[in-house]
Amino acid sequence: MSEQRQDIPDPTVLHLLQPDEQLYLKTRAKDAVLAVTDRRLLVADDQRVLLDISYDRLRRVQFDIERSRPATLVIVPESPSDEPQLLAIPPEEYERAARALAVIGERLSES
């Protein structure tokens, strides 16, 4: 389930991790990266962090797949002050996105 940091050389995400934080996986959306760690979810683009929340601050995740379009991943935080994220996931990232959803689901069931 876990991937080592050195296996995923993505500076968009790696510089955000704490020294003892474990990156489980990341998936690329059209305009951003979703990272799933042992502590939190991160959504970042090349310019900034769009969302950085722990699992206990997550309200809902929705994944929709339609014919002839990228999938849509919606991440809704519990607090209205944290902006929901709408990510377009290309077909080549579906497997990673599905693994991310499994980890997120496990974490939500624990909180």
Regions inferred by a protein language model and the residue ranges of each:
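Polar/charged alpha-helical tracts
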Residues: 15-19, 92, 99-102, 106
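Phosphoinositide-binding peripheral membrane targeting modules
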Residues: 23-70, 76
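Generic hydrophobic/packing signal
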Residues: 65, 77-79, 105-108
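Anionic N-terminal interaction surfaces
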Residues: 1-34
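Generic detector of low-complexity/intrinsically disordered segments
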Residues: 19, 25, 75, 88-89
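Canonical phosphoinositide-binding patch of PH/PH-like domains
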Residues: 78-100
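Short, charged, intrinsically disordered terminal tails
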Residues: 2-8, 99-111
